[in-house]
Amino acid sequence: FEQFYTPSLLPRLLQGENFTPPAVDINTIKKAPTVKITYKGETRNLEVADDDQVYASSSPKALLDITASSADDVISEIRLYQNGKLITGGTRNLVVEDAGKPTDTKTLEVELTEGENILKAVALNSQRTESKPSVITVNYKPAKKEDNNLVGPTLHLLIVGVNNYKNPKYTLNYASADATAFKDAMENGSKEIFSKTSVTFLSDAQAGKDNIVAALNKVKETAAPQDMFVFYYAGHGVISDAKEFFLVPYDVLQLYGNDDALAQKGISAEQLQEFSKEIKAQKQLFILDACQSAGALNEVAASRGAAEEKAIAQLARSTGTHWLTASGSEQFASEFAQLGHGSFTY
């Protein structure tokens, strides 16, 4: 998927678009690795149905062994998902430190949520080919209800909108208005659903990289597995020369042609992925109303739409989170004076 996924491939082929064949010799493609997830807790309540292993537990934590093997390659990464969301558990991202081994085992402890916990492991080899997943289910029922377990989930909102960039060439008209309208709608709509709503709102000069990262770290420290996290961003989004997707905070001075500066001041897809893994909230939604101003849009920028769409699709799939984006392939998000908003948020 990481190498060969092409957004909207069939309709683009039917429209007559020509694609350069990938520079891959099919004879060099290695077999997919295998992976096995083993529950190391009490197994007296084990149920097996259609090869799916289901365990019952009164402990709030589950100890797991994950073993990955590759017959003709090495293991480069092991991923663990809990109820569909990528997690880190007790290891450092489950990345294999010794990339030369054909077999690797990771042991980690997972914090369970009350009820059903579907735990899925996936291994990747050096060519980034994924294994067939290994899945177990742990049904957690606490032996005794604690008072703090009776508190409902919290909604964590991080909302960013940038109209006035440090570089005036990139000024937008309605990003801040869009962000404000979204904040108001979410606060009003969440009152009957969540026990608490925690909101961080960053606009214009407040929306530099340092402040956005600090706000993400705050959510990482406070969000619980039963909570929900929503990240909303209205501003510029670009693909670098190295084909990496970046959000563009207030203090980015150049969108194209300086990847080092973009990496220093921008927020990359890789950084978003790391925060998503480390934030414990299992329900996560990322909304990107990211566009390019007329001053920034040129033939190079327009041609990167497909690469941006691919980057977002890979990010959503790898993290197990949900993403809504304003622009599709070779499009840019529109702003309308008669609406007073960008079309996507409106």
Annotate the PLM regions.
Residues 109-116:
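Surface-exposed, short loops/turns at beta-strand junctions within beta-sandwich domains
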Residues 52, 63-71:
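Short edge beta-strand/loop segments characteristic of extracellular beta-sandwich folds
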Residues 166-184, 336-342:
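Glycine- and acidic-residue-enriched helix-capping/strand-helix junction motifs
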Residues 154, 193, 210-234, 238-301:
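Caspase-like (clan CD) cysteine peptidase catalytic core
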Residues 4-56, 143-145:
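Short, compositionally biased P/S/T/A/G/V-rich stretches that sit at domain boundaries
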Residues 46, 56, 88, 93-106, ...:
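Functional beta-strand-loop-alpha-helix junction segments that form "active/interaction loops"
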Residues 161, 203, 281-346:
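Active-site-proximal C-terminal subdomain of hydrolase catalytic domains
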